[in-house]
Amino acid sequence: MMVTGCLFLAVAARAEARPLLMISVDGLRPGDVLEADKRGLKIPVLRKLAADGMTASGVRNVLPTVTYPNHTTLITGVFPSRHGIAGNVTFDPKQQNMDSWYWYARDIKVKTLWDAVHAHGGKVASLSWPVSVGAASIDYNIPEYWRAHNADDIKLVTALATPGLVDEMQKATGLALAKADGDTVEADTGRLRYAAALIAAHHPEFTTVHLRALDHVEHETGPGSKESNAALESLDRAIGETIAAARKATPDLAVAIVSDHGFSPVEHDVNLIAPFVQAGLITLDAKGKVTSWQAEPWGSASVAVVLANPKDEALKAKVAKLVKELAAKPELGIADVADESAIAKMGGTPMASFWIDFKPGYTMGADPSKPAVSPGTVKGNHGYFPTQPNMRATFILEGDGIAKKSLGEIDMRDVAPTLAKVMDVPFPGPDGKPLY
């Protein structure tokens, strides 16, 4: 009798858990939702979710404020210094790894929400989430991955996806994977249709979806441009259709709308590579490729400086002197320089001995032959220190039983434990805490 009662209580407690759909709109600034009228944005779906749910005025994200480290913090609740995803691209000063990104889940050094839900007996689904290739705890996975940026990439993604899943989604939606993979609004819309079909067919407890178009357009045309606004309005409609279809299949579905970072307009590229070459810290060949290095700047809107031998105090002193001299030149637009202690407080990778942050409007250029400062090659960027207000990300959580609440500004590390609580899943280990 006691055993039966305990089992009943366990089942009843589990029945209160809500399945969850987390949609990341890469590059979505919180003000685009909270100040939509002021910015001339017609996004009724996102506005209603924010009005009806738990909404942050902004999310303090992690160093660097780029896609892959922040998406990994969203599903782990820890800083990059703990989860191991240091940037978007891997550190590769000699460019021997063909511009490889941190695609592979095996590089995550801590437990994820995917792991927690799977271990608790729940099904997990994911579409184009960063750092998801080979994630064993994702039952239905079409990961984010590319190589040649041509049609063969679709074959690669299909091979890396859960066996049979791409064929199943293509048949269910009538959309070829080529129409649901990439960084266009069309691809994001297709990806959302896949998500709705997947939820209807398999009823996963946890689904993660990454939308890439807004970020892409903001880089090309700048944040708040008419093109960026048009992209967001299109995504708003597609998100609304997806939620409606998903809730038809799973009525108690909770929805989290998140982003990884904000955006800043860019006007200037800064050549940081040339001063390192002139100081004898980097050697380039005739084509401008690195042949040897002692210290390498790595990044864009903020720049990690990695030393070949960080225990070499003479080298560290030489680099510290150079960085100080660069920061003293106002034309370079350097806002701040962090040492190892400050980097550790912001949770950045311990690979970096120094970290240079640019002012809004400035970013590091990629061409060592260009002048010290030249016109920007992109119109918008992110990656600055998370202390910069325009880097704030978005968080909205909505669903039955979730209180309407203005959260103010939150820490990104609080997102994962909050979502674990929504799903009633044990999740030990995060640095953050539930928001309710």
Where are these regions (language model features)?
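Substrate-binding rim/cap in mid-to-C-terminal beta-strand-loop elements of soluble/periplasmic
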Residues: 278-320, 378-422
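Structural recognition of the beta-strand scaffold that forms the well-ordered cores
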Residues: 20-24, 57-58, 73-75, 124-128, ...
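His/Asp/Glu-rich, glycine-adjacent segments
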Residues: 79-222, 318
